[in-house]
Curated annotation (Swiss-Prot):
Provenance organism: Cellvibrio japonicus (strain Ueda107) (Pseudomonas fluorescens subsp. cellulosa)
Name this polypeptide is given: Cell division topological specificity factor
Cell division recorded as keyword: yes
GO biological process: cell division; regulation of division septum assembly
Pfam family, one: MinE
Family statement drawn from the similarity comment of this UniProt entry: Belongs to the MinE family.
Entry keyword Cell cycle: yes
Organismal lineage: Bacteria, Pseudomonadati, Pseudomonadota, Gammaproteobacteria, Cellvibrionales
Keywords of the record: Cell cycle, Cell division
Record function comment: Prevents the cell division inhibition by proteins MinC and MinD at internal division sites while permitting inhibition at polar sites. This ensures cell division at the proper site by restricting the formation of a division septum at the midpoint of the long axis of the cell.
Length: 85
């Protein structure tokens, strides 16, 4: 930044830059909204996990719960299985 930059008039934002900024806000909002929901692949993953477990142990599908917890830096896949005695 030079001393002459202080004397130059500030340019008004162009319509393209305004549109870009608005689009970035919309995309960020949609990503945030989508991250709060469960992922699309979770039901299929749950069924595949149940199928693998059933190869070794007879279980009911109601005994398996799969959750995804999203935090700021990472996502955690939580799998709880109630095993028969």
């Amino acid at each position: 930044m030079s001393i002459f930059d202080y004397f130059r008039a500030k340019r008004a934002p162009t319509s393209a830059s305004l549109a870009k900024e608005r689009l970035q806000i919309i995309v960020a909002h949609e990503r945030n909204k989508r991250s709060l929901q469960q992922p699309d692949y979770l039901p299929q993953m749950r069924e595949e996990i149940i199928a693998v477990i059933r190869k070794y142990i007879p279980i009911d599908s109601s005994q398996v719960s799969v959750n995804v917890d999203n935090s700021e830096n990472c996502s955690v896949l939580e799998l709880n299985i109630t095993l028969p005695d």
